[in-house]
Each structure stands twice: as structure tokens, then as C-alpha cells.
Amino acid sequence: MNCLSRRLSHTLSAKSAIAAALALLFSTAAGGAAAATPGNDPVALGQIRNAALQSNWAYERLEDLTDLIGPRLAGSPGAAAAVTQVADAMRKLGAKVTLQPVKVPHWVRGVETASLVDYAGRPAGLSQKVVLSALGGSGATPAAGLRAQVIVLHDLDELKARAAEVKGRIVLFDVPFDQTMADHGLAGQAYGQGVLYRGLGTRLAAQAGAAAVLVRSVGGADFRLPHTGSSGLQDGARIPAAAVAAEDAMLMSRLAKRGPLTMQLTLTPQILPDTDSFNVIADLPGTDKADEIVIVSGHLDSWDLATGANDDGTGVTSAMAVIETLKKLDFQPRRTIRVVAWMNEEIGTRGAQAYVDANKALAEKHVAAIENDEGSGRVFGMRTSVPAESMKLFAPLRAALLPMGAAGFQRTDVLGTGDLSGLERAGVPSFSPLIDDSTYFNYHHTAADTFDKVKPEDLRRHVAVMATTAWFLANMNEPIGRTPAPPAGERGR
């Protein structure tokens, strides 16, 4: 049994799950009309699961989003087109659609080139190109670029110890992504270790007087792909910052061991005035508890290097498909199921904050929130921040997901996933699909995050887990409690 299997198996209540699963297996084969609000009986849960597993609606919407629009960085024409496309698709389903205004940052990538122009042993007249990509929020070099010596660092302690050497130089944080952790079901933790340098590391380098800062790309595969992402730079100290392909970071480390290493770097991004955008909100109204809300969500924006199929096209289209699945079955939930396509997750989560600000008085009416933002790998169940004493209430849901091998439920005190962090701080229990993300960071934030990387059968499984979970939450009789507020600043990826 591998680590992921052990992690999932200990969460299952075998006796209750198997008993309920047997009921499902004998009852869900029959089709036919269903009551408008059938509740959480095994037949209804099985019908939702099976309907989702047989539909390619989300996959078709993903193709529309990625192939017809392309990149969707907040503030860009692509992001605006995506808002219109998603809103239109949800209106066609009969959902009640609202566009919630959000002021978003408008960062534009410019020229990005780099070469190693001087190093020990360099043949006269030669230089070596470095593959890199500017980080979100990066400052710019002069138009003609800057030339400076590179100092290679391997952790923040080394930055502190060598602070006197940093001023006026180009800092490179050469910290490899731990693919072994990713292969053993800990890709998120591996990413967290690396992203520390893209965030805090860039800010500390700027404070130390660096002329520019580079980070080794936070991701696996190492196919000379730079992985972009948000920097930790702040106004008043926005030095040029970029992610370097892993192979180039290793090359620079080797050359720096031979002697002084000089780079010619040109980055010309711009930070334009904030612009208007929107969260897309689509409601499937409830019945007797219509004033209570269950959110199902993904983020609509993407980075500008690719079409954001995995990050987060699959998340937003699987959320949209929850309403499509229930509409197809003519099921109406007791509580309102609200699909939210968040805007601006990648550079600041302003869409999520706008939603929290607008709904402070209604926080208690938000029963639960689901976000799918960890790629399109095979899903095995759910992670959740519900109180420990509420976990037993989910045995019927786990039983419904057991036939498709997605009954694993993993509880954590703080889920803190991106767009849901503000709701979680308000006490709203959060859920996120438990996904095999061992290869997710091969493509994450790169030019290779494209539609062809998504398997339709895996996306169908995402929809099945999300739709069944959303329905279950929307029809529960028992309260599931509130989540204790996480520490300030706690958030996911």
C-alpha cells in the first residue's frame, strides 16, 4: 500500500460505508423520474454520481474556455471574455447569474531575456541564454537591461549571513522542487517549501538591496520550463524578479563555483492602473432553506503563459457542471447551491475578498464552501475543515462515493485554500477535492498548462465528487458546525 492509500484508508468507516454502498449498488441502476427534492437517500446520491460520470459537459466547457479564449490573467481582455462566456453558459442552464464587481490589478508582462555574459573559463565572444519568466508584480529593468554579478543562495539563512554581498547584485535562490515528496502524495508540501523563496525570498532580497532576484522554478519535470507565479515584492521595492528554468539555475550554480558570474538581464513588465472585472455567481435556488448557501467554486483567471487548463480551468468548469448535473436530473436542493467563478486568484485573491466583504452580514448563512484548485488528477475524496465531531455525519456521502473509489475524507484544522481562506476565517467549513497531484506541478504556471493535459475521465470524476458533495451539504438535516478561525495570513496555494 502506498502513502496515499494509507492516508485515505484510515479515514473510512468501513462498516457504515460498505453497508450503505451495497444499498447504492442495488438501487442506483434504475433510472426514471425523481422527486424535485429527493434528499440524501442513497438512490439520489447514486443518481447524481452516475449522471456526472456519464457526462462530458465540463470537458466541453473547458475546451471552450481554453481553446477559444486562451490565457486569462486578471485585467486582460481574455479574463473579460471568460466572464462573459461563463455567465452565458450558466444562464443557458437556467441558473440565476450575478456579476459581482471586483477591482483587479493589471500587470502586463513585457520583454524578458537573460544571458550569462562573463564567467570563469568562458571562451571569448560567447554568452549563454537563460530561460526565465518574470514573476507577477515584478519591477522592470532599464529598457537596455542591467548587467550585474550573480550571487547564488540556497536558503534564507544564507541570505541573512551574506547580506553584505547582496547589494547591487542579482540574487539567485537555487532551491530544487522536491519531486520525491510529490511522488509520495505530498506535492502541496513540496510546493510550499519552494514557493517560500518566490514570495518571502524575493521581498527579503529587495530589502537587502539586490539589483534583481531570480528563483529556481517551483515545479517538477525540469523540461526547461520556467514556472511563473506571484512574487512577494511590495510597492516601493519592486526590483526585477523572475523564475528561472531548473536547468538554468543548476548551470548558474555550477558556473558560480568556478568564479564570478555576470548576467545581462532585461525585464520590462508594467503595473497599470487597477481595472474593473467580476466574479461570476450562478445560483441554483433552494427550497425550504433557500437563504442558506453552499458554495462550489474554482477561479476563472489564469497566468498569461498558457491557457490555464489545470489552473484552474478544470476547477471552474467542474463547479459549473454541478448545476448542469442537478438540472439534468431535475433535482432542486433544500439550500441554495452557489457556483462562484472567482476572479484574480493568481495575483491577490481580490475576487474572493470582494465576496467576503459583500457578505459579512450573511456569513452565518454560508453553510459550507467547496473549491477545486489543485489540478485535474484522479480524485479520491475530499479534504475538509469541518469540526472533528461532524465527520461522522458524512458516512452516507462516503458510501455514495465508494463505488467510484472516492470515499477518502481527510480532515484538517485549517484547509485555507486560496479563495476560500476569507470564508474560512469567517467560520465557514471548507472542502477541497483530494487529488493525486503528483504530476500537477510539472505544468503548473507554465506555458504547458494546456487542454491536452486533461483526461476527460478524470474531469468527470471531479464533477461526480463535487456534485454529490454539494448536494449532500445542501440537504443535510444536522448542522456541521463552524470552523475555528485560522491564524492571520494562513492560506493555501
Regions found by a protein language model. Give the residues of each.
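Bacterial N-terminal signal peptides
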Residues: 15-29
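Noncatalytic luminal/extracellular "stalk/propeptide" segments of secretory-pathway proteins
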Residues: 37-44, 63, 67-183
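N-terminal capping segment at the start of a domain
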Residues: 39-76, 102, 225-233, 301, ...
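Soluble metallo-hydrolase cores and metallopeptidase-like ectodomains found primarily
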Residues: 43-44, 119, 129-164, 231-309, ...
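Second-shell loop/turn segments in exported
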Residues: 45-53, 67-77, 148-156, 161, ...
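Metal-dependent peptidase/peptidase-like ectodomains
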Residues: 53, 91, 121, 143, ...
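Alpha-helical metal-binding/catalytic segments enriched in His/Glu/Asp
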Residues: 90, 197-198, 205, 280, ...
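Active-site-adjacent substrate-binding region
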Residues: 206, 212, 216-217, 234, ...
